[in-house]
Amino acid sequence: QMCIRDSMVDFGIPLFANIHLCGSVLTEVFFVMTVSKVLYGQLPAPMTMVLFCILLGIFAVGAPGVPGGTVMASLGLIISVLGFDDTGTGLMMTIFALQDSFGTACNVTGDGALTLMLTGYAKKHNIQEVQSGEIL
């Protein structure tokens, strides 16, 4: 039986909600490849995708909590790095809006799982909870 400590929730959930955006980032990468194949007939070059993924990971940290924020923050990347035109950009925004709730569910579930892992780590290494104002 795993019990999550309040201090882990207070620390882990806000941290992971801001930096752990697997649902948003993964779906956007897959949608970029799909839209590119459908509209332009080919996938982006592998090195272009590597650059896009790295930059998307950085840009996504600036957009947590905003519905569709990841795709809005990355529009410049989609246009400049991948070379999408207005049609590709519009299709990306439409598809992302349709599935954004599933990406959010993935993000929230992942945040809870990571908080459980953090609790397990603290328990395994005998890390004691410190009350606020208490001196170690």
Where are these regions (language model features)?
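Membrane-water interface at loop-to-transmembrane-helix junctions
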Residues: 7-21
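Transmembrane alpha-helical segments and their short flanking loops
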Residues: 29-136
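Short glycine/threonine-rich loop-to-helix capping motif typified by GTGT followed
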Residues: 21-31
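Short, small-residue-biased leader/transition segments that mark boundaries at the very start
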Residues: 2-4
